[in-house]
A protein has these predicted regions:
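Catalytic cores of secreted/periplasmic lytic hydrolases that degrade extracellular macromolecules
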Residues: 1-72, 76-181
Length: 181
């Protein structure tokens, strides 16, 4: 849980910085560089023109994933950390590697992302939920909660993960039941 909490703290700091700059007219070179870095990491297309910053997309992506939701999903995906994938690859979420980016080190599970640490696995997972096109509806639902001034919780978000599993809603129901226990 400390890794999830620290990841969310870093995201919150970036989000708060973005919110504080949203109506700023003048940008220093350091601020522009920071904004460019954030946009790149969150896969947000931006021309570099500070008058045309895609604020809605940025704020939709630069946001937390509820800690208890990430912990529940890690437990479900890794068999409470006992799976071969978790033990050998530090991969708690069953994240597959992309074509051409797979390394097949001895003792590792082939075809799946390998992480140097659990912290790196958590970071990659949170980034995936915040950037991958498949989770766009998840991010839009979270943004709607923000707009309605409601808290972003695991209870509110687990069922918003459309397309996360080939099992569909039954997997979301499984996660929700696991979270409730």
């Amino acid at each position: 849980m400390p890794y999830i909490t620290s990841q969310n703290a870093a995201i919150t700091a970036e989000r708060n910085w973005l919110i504080s700059k949203q109506y700023q007219g003048q940008w220093s070179p350091a601020e522009r560089a920071r904004l460019k870095d954030i946009a790149k990491r969150y896969k947000v297309k931006w021309s570099g023109n500070t008058r045309k910053i895609p604020w809605n997309t940025l704020l939709e992506r630069v946001d937390i994933i509820p800690t208890s939701m990430v912990a529940t999903m890690a437990a479900a995906e890794s068999g409470w950390g006992t799976s071969k994938l978790a033990r050998n690859n530090n991969n708690l979420f069953g994240m597959k590697c992309m074509k051409g980016r797979c390394t097949n080190a001895p003792g590792k599970v082939k075809g799946y992302s390998q992480f140097s640490s659990v912290k790196e696995s958590v970071s990659a997972y949170v980034t995936n939920l915040n950037t991958h096109p498949a989770y766009s509806s998840f991010r839009k639902s979270r943004a709607q909660l923000r707009k309605a001034d409601q808290e972003v919780t695991a209870t509110a978000m687990i069922h918003k993960l459309k397309g996360y599993s080939t099992k569909g809603k039954s997997y979301n129901n499984y996660l929700f039941a696991m979270y409730q226990d």
